[in-house]
């Protein structure tokens, strides 16, 4: 295989299956299905990968959008899905992908980058925690104190992906 086939580059549409396999191994198999706005063939130019011997071994996804915040137009990028097979970690792949992504965002005039998750690597590249996250946990006894007669709780299925995606967006 030619050396230019390997290394850091955009995903080729024909490699979507290899990317899905990586994301399924590192995260969970349904990740591309619940993030179709990011992980899709049409967004392949914003899906940077490291390929070794024809296999996608590391990945970062980017979505770029224009938003208005209090009347100010901004170009934002959202980064996520950073994944590397365990057998390929420690080679600098994720760092190379993040560095390339940050350079592309800078060159394209992105004003603000949001990163999904936290790793020391993000901090090394200038990312910082902003805002607050809240996490609440209830045990069964505490949950039984709520009047939930007006609600139905059920498991989501593949048929719910479009509706859940619309709520997310």
What are these regions (language model features)?
Residues 1-59, 63-64, 71-78, 144-169:
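Short amphipathic alpha-helix that is part of the acyltransferase structural core
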Residues 65-67, 87, 120:
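Short coil/turn motifs at secondary-structure junctions
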Residues 84, 90-103, 114:
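Conserved acetyl-CoA-binding loop-helix of GNAT-fold acetyltransferases
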Residues 107-111, 117-135:
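Conserved active-site alpha-helix within GNAT-family acetyltransferase domains
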Residues 134-142:
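Gly/Ser-rich phosphate-binding catalytic loop and adjacent alpha/beta segment
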């Amino acid at each position: 295989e030619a050396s230019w086939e390997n290394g850091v580059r955009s995903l080729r549409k024909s490699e979507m299956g290899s990317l899905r396999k990586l994301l399924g191994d590192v995260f969970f198999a349904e990740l591309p299905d619940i993030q179709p706005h990011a992980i899709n063939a049409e967004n392949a130019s914003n899906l940077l990968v490291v390929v070794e011997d024809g296999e996608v071994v590391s990945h970062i996804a980017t979505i770029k959008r224009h938003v208005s915040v209090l009347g100010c137009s901004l170009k934002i990028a959202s980064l996520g899905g950073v994944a590397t097979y365990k057998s390929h970690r420690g080679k600098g792949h994720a760092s190379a992908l993040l560095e390339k992504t940050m350079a592309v965002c800078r060159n394209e005039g992105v004003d603000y980058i949001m990163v999904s998750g936290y790793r020391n690597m993000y901090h090394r590249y200038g990312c910082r925690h902003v805002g607050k996250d809240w996490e609440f946990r209830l045990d069964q006894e505490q949950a039984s104190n709520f009047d939930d007669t007006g609600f139905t709780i059920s498991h989501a299925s593949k048929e719910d992906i479009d509706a859940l995606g619309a709520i997310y967006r």
